[in-house]
């Protein structure tokens, strides 16, 4: 016999936990990334296609939400990551790609050069960009497209989240895309975009 009270209570706790996690993600991204979220560069990022089915802006927010979620998961294991550096690094990691057709002669050149260009754009938005955030941005292409390994755990987090989001972007619409994690990340990205586009 099923215990409906238990099931209802359990579902409510899970729902409350997910809502709390979403609110924490949004709070962290808003707190540490506000200057970037309101920047003209990130707004422009929504006008440029990226990974076939996405835009640079949508991809960026998925990477950021995924990165923060990884930080929370690691915290449960007793591993503390620098969330402000992760937020700044992930929000800026692909801003150098903007207007890529005007800057790069090939996809290979874009892949190789955009991390350095992204650091330059980040420094325009945040003049006192930390070395750690700059390293996260500059080395985010590892291991696909670059042999330059990130110098910090935070750099690895953003790099992994970037690859995860890129795969999700490429397979958008497939069954593998319809998971709770994907929906959480997408809803966070949508909510942040909506909030900052007003």
Locate predicted features.
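Divalent metal-dependent phosphate-bond-processing catalytic cores, especially two-metal-ion Mg2+/Mn2+ enzymes
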Residues: 2-31, 48-81, 86, 92, ...
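N-terminal glycine-rich anion-binding loops that anchor highly charged ligand groups
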Residues: 37-39
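Short glycine/proline-rich turn/loop motifs
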Residues: 41-48
């Amino acid at each position: 016999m099923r215990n409906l009270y238990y099931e209802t209570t359990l579902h409510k706790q899970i729902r409350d936990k997910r809502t709390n996690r979403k609110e924490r993600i949004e709070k962290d991204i808003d707190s540490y990334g506000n200057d970037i979220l309101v920047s003209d560069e990130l707004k422009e990022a929504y006008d440029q296609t990226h990974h076939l089915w996405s835009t640079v802006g949508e991809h960026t927010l998925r990477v950021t939400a995924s990165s923060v979620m990884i930080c929370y998961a690691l915290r449960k294991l007793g591993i503390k990551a620098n969330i402000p550096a992760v937020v700044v690094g992930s929000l800026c990691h692909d801003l150098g790609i903007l207007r890529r057709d005007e800057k790069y002669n090939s996809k290979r050149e874009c892949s190789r050069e955009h991390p350095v260009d992204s650091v330059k754009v980040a420094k325009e938005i945040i003049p006192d960009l930390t070395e750690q955030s700059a390293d996260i941005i500059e080395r985010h292409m590892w291991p696909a497209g670059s042999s330059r390994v990130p110098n910090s755990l935070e750099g690895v987090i953003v790099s992994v989240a970037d690859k995860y989001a890129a795969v999700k972007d490429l397979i958008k619409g497939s069954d593998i895309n319809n998971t709770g994690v994907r929906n959480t990340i997408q809803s966070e990205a949508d909510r942040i975009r909506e909030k900052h586009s007003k």
